[in-house]
C-alpha cells in the first residue's frame, strides 16, 4: 500500500501545473534534471513537461526511469519510482554500487538475479517496443557480467524470437549490440538508431541489412541522402526479398537501379509469392528464366504458369518515380496484386495445369 506522501506525489505528478509551482515541485521531490516529473496515468510513462504528449521518443517507462535514477545515484527517485510500480530487479541488473544494491534489495529486488529471471527481463524490455526501451536494453545488458553464465545457444534463441532476424557475432557484447540496433531499425526509432550508429560506425552494413529486411525505407532514404549506401542495388534487393511483403524496400531498391527480374528470381528461391508478384506488377518480364528457377525448386504450378507469358503485364497504377518514403508507403498502403489475381483466375479456369503434390 502506498504511503500518504507517495500517493500525494503520484496525484501531483499525474496533473499538469504551471511554472509557478516549479519551486514547490523541486522541494516535493518531483524534479529531475531540468524539469518537473510527469507520470501518465494511462500508459505509466515518465516524461518532462516539455513533452505534453505520451509516446515521444523521450518518454521513459518506470523501469527505464529507475535504471536512470540508479545510474545517477538518486536515492530519492529510486524509492519514488519503485513506490509507483517500477520493478526493483531492474536496478540490480546494472550491478550498481553496494549501497544502491542494498536499497534495491530492501525495496523488493532479489539478488543474485537468476539466469531465467535475467532472460525474462531481457524479453520484457525488448517487448516494450519503444525508443526508451531499446536504449534501456542496450544500457542494461551490453557489457553486463551477469550474462557471462548464459549459454550462447540460449541467448541466440531469445534474441531471434524477439528480433526475427538471424544474428551473428563473435562476442555476447557484439551480438547484443546488433540485437538492440535491429529492434531500433525494425520500429524506426530514429533517436536510438542515431545513438547506436554513432557508437558503432562499423555497423553500417548491419544497419542497411536490417533496414531492408524490416522494410524501413525511411532509414534507407536517410543513408541514401547522406551518400552512405555502401553496397550495390542488386545486393540490397537480395536482403529486401528475404522477407515476405517487403514491398516498400523492393520498390526503393528498384528506384536505386536494382533489377526487377533479379528480385522476381530471388522471391522464387525464397518461396515468397507475394514479393514475386509485386516484382511482376512493377515490370519484371524475364519469365523464361523465372520458369526454369521455379522448376528447379519444385514449384511446378508456377513454372507452368510462366508458360502463359501474355497473362502478365505491369500494373500501371504503381507510379515508378517516387523517391520520398512516405509517398511510397502511401501508394502501397492500398496495393493488391493485379497479376496474382489474374494467376488465381487462370488456375481456376484451367485446372488441368495444376500439379497436385
UniProtKB/Swiss-Prot annotation:
GO terms for cellular component: host cell cytoplasm. It is found in: Host cytoplasm. This is Protein MGF 360-14L. Interacts with host IRF3 and TRIM21; these interactions mediates degradation of IRF3 through TRIM21 and ubiquitin-meditated proteolysis. One of its GO terms (biological process) is symbiont-mediated suppression of host cytoplasmic pattern recognition receptor signaling pathway via inhibition of IRF3 activity. The keyword ATP-binding does not apply. It comes from the Viruses.
Amino acid at each position: 500500500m502506498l504511503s500518504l506522501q507517495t500517493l500525494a506525489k503520484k496525484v501531483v505528478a499525474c496533473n499538469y501545473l504551471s511554472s509557478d509551482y516549479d519551486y514547490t515541485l523541486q522541494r516535493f521531490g518531483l524534479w529531475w534534471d531540468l524539469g518537473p516529473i510527469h507520470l501518465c496515468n494511462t500508459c505509466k510513462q515518465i516524461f518532462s513537461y516539455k513533452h505534453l504528449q505520451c509516446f515521444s521518443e523521450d518518454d521513459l517507462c518506470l523501469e527505464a526511469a529507475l535504471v536512470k535514477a540508479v545510474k545517477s545515484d538518486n536515492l530519492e527517485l529510486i524509492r519514488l519510482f519503485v513506490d509507483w510500480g517500477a520493478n526493483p530487479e531492474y536496478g540490480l541488473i546494472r550491478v550498481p554500487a553496494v549501497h544502491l544494491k542494498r536499497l534495491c534489495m530492501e525495496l523488493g529486488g532479489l539478488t543474485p538475479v537468476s539466469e531465467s529471471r535475467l532472460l525474462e527481463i531481457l524479453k520484457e524490455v525488448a517487448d516494450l517496443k519503444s525508443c526508451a526501451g531499446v536504449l534501456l536494453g542496450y544500457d542494461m545488458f551490453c557489457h553486463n557480467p551477469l550474462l557471462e553464465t548464459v549459454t550462447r545457444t540460449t541467448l541466440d534463441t531469445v534474441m531471434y524470437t524477439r528480433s526475427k532476424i538471424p544474428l551473428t557475432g563473435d562476442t555476447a557484447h557484439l551480438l547484443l549490440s546488433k540485437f538492440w540496433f535491429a529492434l531500433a531499425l525494425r520500429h524506426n526509432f530514429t533517436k536510438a538508431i542515431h545513438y547506436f550508429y554513432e557508437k558503432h560506425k562499423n555497423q553500417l552494413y548491419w544497419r542497411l541489412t536490417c533496414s531492408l529486411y524490416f522494410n524501413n525505407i525511411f532509414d534507407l532514404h536517410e543513408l541514401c541522402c547522406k551518400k552512405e549506401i555502401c553496397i550495390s542495388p542488386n545486393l540490397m534487393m537480395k536482403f529486401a526479398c528475404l522477407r515476405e511483403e517487403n514491398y516498400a524496400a523492393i520498390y526503393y531498391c528498384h528506384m536505386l537501379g536494382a533489377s526487377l527480374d533479379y528480385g522476381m528470381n530471388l522471391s522464387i528461391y525464397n518461396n515468397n509469392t507475394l514479393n514475386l508478384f509485386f516484382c511482376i506488377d512493377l515490370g519484371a518480364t524475364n519469365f523464361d528464366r523465372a520458369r526454369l528457377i521455379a522448376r528447379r525448386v519444385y514449384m511446378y504450378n508456377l513454372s507452368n504458369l510462366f508458360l502463359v507469358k501474355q497473362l502478365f503485364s505491369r500494373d500501371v497504377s504503381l507510379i515508378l518515380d517516387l523517391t520520398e518514403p512516405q509517398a511510397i508507403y502511401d501508394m502501397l498502403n492500398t496495393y493488391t496484386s493485379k497479376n496474382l489475381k489474374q494467376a488465381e483466375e487462370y488456375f481456376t479456369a484451367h485446372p488441368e495445369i495444376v500439379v497436385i503434390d
